[in-house]
Amino acid sequence: MWATHGLAVALALSVLPASRALRQGDCEVCISYLGRFYQDLKDRDVTFSPASIEKELIKFCREARGKENRLCYYIGATEDAATKIINEVSKPLSHHIPVEKICEKLKKKDSQICELKYDKQIDLSTVDLKKLRVKELKKILDDWGETCKGCAEKSDYIRKINELMPKYAPKAASSRTDL
């Protein structure tokens, strides 16, 4: 009898998560972005009240691109956001709660927040552009805020990237030998 109760308890404990703490690599976009935001607030000596933090976060999110913009959307800091959980960021941040803890709470509200991961950056100084897919070449241009109108073939995208590289990635452009 005791063995079955012990087995049931062991089974129940194994099913429940041992800790709700974030693992390494979890919420990387959330932690990074909110960390930069918090540091920006401290550097500019902004008043740490929930209302002022909320206003500043909305302003900060206007400049966000890519995954960071998606995070802003999830917390309700963009104009087109469906839900508003921005107070789940502004209130704890006003009490100087670490961003890791804030992201942990946000994960409980919306698990998508912690599923965001930064895209791997391509090292333009060493990569052979000819071996990349057209999709990856388009992404490089998109990350720079550029488009390639009239590009039909891979070689057109490579030419455009090589043309713009000194402007957007000067270190990579100077270290490349195939130009």
Curated annotation (Swiss-Prot):
Disulfide pairs here are: C27-C114, C30-C103, C61-C72, C148-C151
Stored SUPFAM superfamilies: SAP domain (SSF68906)
Name the Gene Ontology biological process terms: dopaminergic neuron differentiation; neuron projection development; response to unfolded protein
* GO cellular component, as recorded: endoplasmic reticulum; extracellular space; sarcoplasmic reticulum lumen
Q: Where is the segment annotated Interacts with ERN1, EIF2AK3 and ATF6?
A: 93-155
Hey, what's the signal peptide range on this chain?
A: 1-21
Where is this protein found? Secreted; Endoplasmic reticulum lumen; Sarcoplasmic reticulum lumen
Positions of the UniProt region annotated as Interacts with HSPA5: 126-169
Q: Which Gene3D superfamilies match?
A: SAP domain, Saposin-like
- Sequence positions bearing Phosphotyrosine: Y73
Q: Which GO terms describe its molecular function?
A: growth factor activity; lipid binding
- Which InterPro entries does the record cross-reference, listed alphabetically? ARMET-like (IPR045333), ARMET_C (IPR019345), ARMET_N (IPR045332), SAP_dom_sf (IPR036361)
The similarity comment for this entry is:
Belongs to the ARMET family.
* Subunit note: Interacts directly (via SAP domain) with HSPA5/BiP; the interaction inhibits ATP binding to HSPA5/BiP and subsequent nucleotide exchange. Component of a complex containing at least CRELD2, MANF, MATN3 and PDIA4. Interacts (via C-terminus) with ERN1 (via luminal domain); the interaction is decreased in the presence of increasing concentrations of Ca(2+).
Q: What does this protein do?
A: Selectively promotes the survival of dopaminergic neurons of the ventral mid-brain. Modulates GABAergic transmission to the dopaminergic neurons of the substantia nigra. Enhances spontaneous, as well as evoked, GABAergic inhibitory postsynaptic currents in dopaminergic neurons. Inhibits cell proliferation and endoplasmic reticulum (ER) stress-induced cell death. Retained in the ER/sarcoplasmic reticulum (SR) through association with the endoplasmic reticulum chaperone protein HSPA5 under normal conditions.
Record comment regarding domains = The N-terminal region may be responsible for neurotrophic activity while the C-terminal region may play a role in the ER stress response.
Protein name (Swiss-Prot/TrEMBL): Mesencephalic astrocyte-derived neurotrophic factor
Species of origin reads Bos taurus (Bovine)
Q: What is the lineage of its organism?
A: Eukaryota, Metazoa, Chordata, Craniata, Vertebrata
Which gene is transcribed and translated to give this protein?
Answer: MANF
